[in-house]
Amino acid sequence: MNPGDMVLVTGGAGYVGSHLVRMLLAKGYRVRVLDCFLYGDMGLKECYSNPRLEVVRGDICNIRDLIRCMRGVSAVIALAALVGDAACELDQEETLAINVESTKLLSQVVRLAPEVKRVVFASSCSVFGANVGLVLNEGSVLNPVSFYARSRIVSEGILNSELEDCSVVTLRLGTVFGTSPRMRLDLMVNTMTARALSGGKVTVMGGEAWRPHVHVQDVARAFLTAAEAPSEEVSGEIFNVGGNSQNHTVGETADIVAAALPDLGIAVEHVAAVDDLRSYKVSFDKIEYVLKFKPKYSVQRGVEQLRGLLSGGALEVDDPVYSNLIYLRQYGFGGKRVDLEGENEGRKEIAESA
């Protein structure tokens, strides 16, 4: 992939995508974004005047939209998905269509577009699920505990089995945090910081579970790195995205948030654990060794950025748009579900991967 090439970013107006689109444009790429703007278009508004950006309001579940967007494309970065365990449980039919059936459509369309040489797919470290006492690498046994995680596993398999003649790279993202043009306040570090600033304390439920944190700008940079890497280094490969030093328990994360706001005297309150089996401590040796990728942003630095944004009054923190779960509960899915052939088969694949 070279500057001047056309890159298709599905979900390019989202939390990660709005950073990635800016990075691609800054490096001289032409960028086509396919997004349904379920949460609005605030993530891209500042970029609309860039002549190398083309924005298509469309649906990854619509094969016509995918075919139209694939023309002249050298690489696809597939970010569009319904994200989050709780959000995906609201309607498993919607989740199946958006997260799995759309992946099947994408693979079909890419097979018809020989000029597409690279597909980079956004998966999640949540596929590791409940794995206590282990440091998990890309070859570790998966133990998903949510429909969202199972949908990611099935989609990984679809792309790698259906696109044998295309260079497919899978990125399993850690627990993302940090500021973004399309802001989210429903992610662990972001939520803790917002509550600390508004209420003077962080409440920790349990606290022993592990999470691998990674800043949203580092995630966007990882996608750019994977898209540009030589095929012999990345084709067919899976990379966990994050840094070893940013594996923290939930309790440690709360302490870091409080320590990053020293003048506010933030209290950390521990209460009984909730019914959440997820715990995964992840190795990021592979991405550092193969792609020379290391995160630039610590959790503390991310909290400081969040404070600057939230204290400035630029956001109404109670606006549902900053929480995928609350927004979808209030406004629904915007009629995105489609009745696609193979839906029952896809649901069976998800169930069997549990």
Regions found by a protein language model. Give the residues of each.
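Conserved Rossmann-fold NAD(P)-dependent oxidoreductase catalytic core, especially the SDR/UDP-sugar
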Residues: 78, 104-147
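N-terminal Rossmann/SDR dinucleotide-binding element
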Residues: 1-75
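Short alpha-helix in the Rossmann-fold core of NAD(P)-dependent oxidoreductases
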Residues: 81, 91, 98-103, 120-123, ...
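Flexible, glycine-rich beta-alpha linker
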Residues: 128-129, 146-147, 171-187
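C-terminal substrate-binding subdomain of Rossmann-fold SDR/epimerase-dehydratase oxidoreductases
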Residues: 200, 204-208, 212-354
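NAD(P)H-binding glycine-rich loop region in Rossmannoid oxidoreductase-like domains
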Residues: 60-98
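Glycine-rich NAD(P)-binding loop of the Rossmann-fold in SDR/ketoreductase-type enzymes
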Residues: 61, 94-105, 142, 146, ...
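Active-site Tyr-X1-5-Lys
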Residues: 130-132, 143-169, 197
